[in-house]
Amino acid sequence: MTKDAVNLDAYTVSFMPFYTEYQGPTEEFKDYKFEDTIYFRGKELKREKSATPSSSDNTTSNTFSNGAILSGNTITGKIVSVNNYEREGTDRNELARLQELISLIDVINQ
């Protein structure tokens, strides 16, 4: 997807948020809550820091009608499910942890 797309709603976002290919060190997700705002950028998945958007942010980002925000390669969404379980400490479970703890809502238009 390119930023110069005229009608963003006509495009399909090209990643599946439930199956990110994230590997490596992660943020600690155990304190995340339902409806927390997060963002997905490349292979990073982090909670959004509270901040007041500047006027320059408005000129470099586009907003989908469903509320998802496209800014460069960043997609913003909200946590829609939080499933707590004990961390097993293996690399494979890092990916499973991300898939089970965090879901993005209304990112892919259908």
UniProtKB/Swiss-Prot annotation:
Region (Disordered): 45-69
GO cellular component terms listed in the entry, alphabetical order: cytoplasm; nucleus; ribonuclease H2 complex
The keyword Nucleus is assigned to this record: yes
Compositional bias (Low complexity): 51-66
GO biological process entries: mismatch repair; RNA catabolic process
Principal location listed in the UniProt entry: cytoplasm
Localization annotation: Cytoplasm; Nucleus
Protein keywords: Cytoplasm, Nucleus
Subunit and partners: The RNase 2 complex is a heterotrimer composed of the catalytic subunit RNH201 and of the non-catalytic subunits RNH202 and RNH203.
Function description: Non catalytic subunit of RNase H2, an endonuclease that specifically degrades the RNA of RNA:DNA hybrids. Participates in DNA replication, possibly by mediating the removal of lagging-strand Okazaki fragment RNA primers during DNA replication. Mediates the excision of single ribonucleotides from DNA:RNA duplexes.
Further comment found in the protein's record: Present with 556 molecules/cell in log phase SD medium.
Family: Belongs to the RNase H2 subunit C family. Highly divergent.
Protein name from the UniProt record: Ribonuclease H2 subunit C
Organism this protein belongs to: Saccharomyces cerevisiae (strain ATCC 204508 / S288c)
